[in-house]
Amino acid sequence: MTDKIKQQLQKTLLGHVVNDLKVVIITPISSAFKKLKLILECTEIYKNGFFDNTDFKTQNGISGLLVLIPQGVSSQDIMYAFSDTHIIFFGYAGSLCKDITIGTILEIETARLPDGQSISLEVFNSYNSVVCGYSPCLLGEIAFKYCEKAFVEKCHIVDMEICYCAYAAKVNHNKFTAMVVVSDIPNTINFWELCKYNKENFKQASNQALEYIATYIN
């Protein structure tokens, strides 16, 4: 993809063209976007494109961008707007292992795509690293089918966006790191039905993960 096409894609998705970026933080979670905006002391939010986004500078003077991406297959679109950039993903995931409980912070070392392809990710090496499988949802018959397949493939968790983004990042020669907090046990515990204890653990873990990402890039 040429620079001209990338710039046009940036204008469409972000509402502006960005240059000399070293790091891009992406998340499909609106509360995480707001939290990171405060931590990174971002000011203006660009709303002229498809994705809300805001720029920031680290304490070392490195230019970065924070982007609220959509959930689902469209999440990967942002990957095509950059090349040779470190992209850091934060999101939630469903656990397939009984010892990976609600509120566990994890790094993704491998993304297993629906076609069986495996993609290696960059890791921080600060939290446990796991294999992430693909599932388009976490409830119902479709979730059962995909989660069962992921479990057989020795995946520890499932998430849709990580798999799509990992593939697109590889195609565009981006360095991709993903950190998640476990929010669901597919077809057993739903995020919206967490008990008070699990909610508190989950909230604390989410804040800890976001603080870690902000500290890491600084």
Regions from the language model: what does each represent?
Residues 168-198:
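Zn-dependent metallopeptidase/amidohydrolase metal-coordination segment
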Residues 31, 73-77, 160-164, 197-208:
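Conserved active-site and cofactor/substrate-binding residues in soluble primary-metabolism enzymes
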